[in-house]
């Protein structure tokens, strides 16, 4: 993202690019800039693009990020949904952080990896959760410097998790073995392990469903309708340092007042990004 789109074709064979500033190599803030992730989030959450209050979604939603400037958690209950999710999954050193005018946001798990408190404050009567993060090493596993450093790095998060767990009615903790946060190629296996663990709670869920039925029929959750197109009032370029705003808008070729569908916008952004 430090190369203008006109020159990116010259870098297609590079495995890694490190910018040089003032005769020094600058280490990036993350191995993955996240453009494809952002594109995917924008694609799947297209129907919710104009919903800025997450309580108005078919199922009310919130997510957490961590501001590394203040070391405090940031609770997203509104805004642009893909941006909120992108910030909440920005694993430090793996994905680049999300920067705002005053904050540098990374994965919320740095401070709070399980948001039972926020769900209760949101009005949840029953909290059902699944925890798949690091649970801490036993004494016998703390025989290496790496293990000790990892344990120290998670001390705050682990202590907070125990507090959040006490606020949970049903907690599902699949046994993941060697699977970790970066096991992107083990999706099917991870889902299968979660499913097997959830089956152990089948009787609990059935009793819970029966107790809820005693309150009468529940309103069905109506999914968002897919949106054919949006009409932009204005188009503004921010954070640009490499080429003129006019060039960017020219390549984007999307004008205020025109109907813009998802495929067209994704195609133009891909072209612009190079």
Model segments located where?
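Patatin-like phospholipase
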Residues: 1-270, 274
